[in-house]
């Protein structure tokens, strides 16, 4: 999550410093891909425009739920993808908190990646969408992969792998005999 937030904020800082104000043509990269500065007070695809504080509070709630849920995930790929989604949501939340706007949590999110056939977006938006879709695919089609850490017993102690009998574990373990 920290890497996503850092990259998101660095790219947004670059966009604000280097790109012309909203309404200019921007920088053409290739095909329909442009860098063009835009400020979004709503959510992805400009939904909820003018509802910055509500969007920010929803983001805080989603981040909190994802952090809470991540405690029960035992698959490294799932943890990484949840971290990517949390990083994206946190990156956009940082904009709402620290960029001038319309009062409490009313800052605008910096968007700058423009495709002529798609709404303008940023790295955080990409992390949320791509991470969320990848997480949904993994949760749907692949079983949990353990992180390598032993599961905890109800007492909080790591459980031993395999059955134990008389203090010896594994196949051919000693048994109590009369």
What is each model feature region?
Residues 1-178:
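Alpha-helical transmembrane bundles and membrane-interface segments of multipass inner-membrane proteins
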